[in-house]
């Protein structure tokens, strides 16, 4: 079980920091699990630190719920990695400052969704069709498979196809190209009413739109649908229950063509060689899964992670842990392999991968809107657990490290962490954060070192001439005064004292994920911050935030996960720089288009993916 310590874990388990126990929330409740107002200890140092808050005081924000109180709806806030939800794994959340957003207030994928409005209350058949006794299924939540099956049933079962059109058993001829003016039976009119209702429900589905066009094309009759392909873009108001059974399938985006991979006919694409064309396949939206597609494309363009999957190096790391679960890593690798062996115009269906991620993290079951950062956390945690090289984790040692200098203490803490958590995923994404808490009366300073997967950065308030990423980093690492109700208890003074809290980066990861906190929380509502943050594409120098002297803290941007919309609904896309060609592309679900590097910086940037620069670029 991953032992990356979250703030909530440290607050709940540390006898030094907490006198009163914190109740563990049930599934579906929101609990902040990143750095809040107080400093916390790592799991090995929880008995060593000399500060503890007064028991009646809690500095963690209270949960807040929006919308219906169903499990999936009320569980869209910050994830709590509990063993009863995702098995026996548990890891730290990203390190963040300030209040976290409440339940239901994430940057949610999809568009047109409003919290508090159940999509299951919608009906997609017109009233006249229902009044006439249409025999179609009256389910209020239609999957793509159901729509396709019902659509196929609209054919007159006792009719037959002829060279001049379509005839019923009674002898009436129906011209498919002139249905509106052909004589027809009352049953046929009912079916056309039902057809109209289905068309309204599936008007945004590329697959059913193609079928409708073929149905109305003169001189052709509809083909019998035996198996519906994965949906391309399910209407955002639908709550589909589609459960695909096939592997990753390539479906042609162009209308009127047979399914299967094909090359784009856009100018310039056909002249690209196979090497430069790799990695440009789109991902089909299975229904509000744009948050997942955005993160998958960012990870697909992570050079070392891509090579780990393409070269099948993950196979040697599978099955080392006591848990035999390896399906998530295998499906993720297969998906990356499919993306990188497809033509630019191909669309890959990530249905099998979604099946595995929702088995690992049930919060992603169904087709509700989700937060991209939360999805990234769960995904990396699951991949890490399945390829962890540590077969048997040693028990935590009671050895004290307080007598060591901070630099040596940090190294020892990192060594102890690797004794329990050692994977290729962690090699790429995990860094180490140093937290210090200093008493202003006696000067006693306590330090802890915690692993992190990403950093959540507050966004500077409006009024600045320009908000830069460096401003956000400085705001994250600046000294905070803990006073008043926030005073912790100093064990040396044996009283609550005014203290200074400060963060710094002890160890920089190879892949640095920066989360821009685009939510402003108030007691009334949570709003999205659309502040434009200017971030560099190359040579992001973070050496001033290092806890010790280092020259290895310069990064280059290679991917951005964007969110457009509001807290009530929106859409996720990704901007990625190819590790092969170095060119930027926009990944918008099934659509992949080239873009200029000058277009990468927008006010929709939500997650920034930086890779550690090679020595020549740091000159």
Swiss-Prot record:
SUPFAM superfamilies in alphabetical order: Cysteine proteinases (SSF54001)
Cell compartment(s), UniProt: Cytoplasm; Cytoplasm, Perinuclear region
Disulfide bonds listed in the record: none
Region (Necessary for interaction with MDM4): 1-213, 417-517
Keywords: Biological rhythms, Cell cycle, Cytoplasm, Hydrolase, Membrane, Metal-binding, Myogenesis, Nucleus, Protease, Thiol protease, Ubl conjugation pathway, Zinc
GO cellular component, one term: centrosome
Regulation of activity: Cleavage is inhibited by ubiquitin in a dosage-dependent manner. Cleavage is blocked by ubiquitin aldehyde.
One Pfam family recorded for the sequence: UCH
Catalytic residues of the enzyme: 290, 571
Main subcellular location of this protein, as a coarse class: cytoplasm
Ranges of compositional bias, category Low complexity: 259-269
EC number: 3.4.19.12
Alphabetized GO MF terms: cyclin binding; cysteine-type deubiquitinase activity; identical protein binding; metal ion binding; ubiquitin protein ligase binding
Residue ranges with Polar residues bias: 1-17, 134-146
Annotated positions binding Zn(2+): 439, 442, 490, 493
Gene3D superfamilies: Cysteine proteinases (3.90.70.10)
Reactions it catalyzes: Thiol-dependent hydrolysis of ester, thioester, amide, peptide and isopeptide bonds formed by the C-terminal Gly of ubiquitin (a 76-residue protein attached to proteins as an intracellular targeting signal)
Free-text function comment from the UniProt entry: Hydrolase that deubiquitinates polyubiquitinated target proteins such as MDM2, MDM4 and CCND1. Isoform 1 and isoform 2 possess both ubiquitin-specific peptidase and isopeptidase activities. Deubiquitinates MDM2 without reversing MDM2-mediated p53/TP53 ubiquitination and thus indirectly promotes p53/TP53 degradation and limits p53 activity. Has no deubiquitinase activity against p53/TP53. Prevents MDM2-mediated degradation of MDM4. Plays a role in the G1/S cell-cycle progression in normal and cancer cells. Plays a role in the regulation of myogenic differentiation of embryonic muscle cells.
Family from the record: Belongs to the peptidase C19 family. USP2 subfamily.
Domain notes: The different N-terminus extensions of isoform 1 and isoform 2 determine their respective subcellular localization and differential effect on myoblast fusion and accumulation of muscle-specific proteins. The different N-terminus extensions of isoform 1 and isoform 4 are not essential for their catalytic activity.
Name under which the protein is recorded: Ubiquitin carboxyl-terminal hydrolase 2
Gene assigned in the entry: Usp2
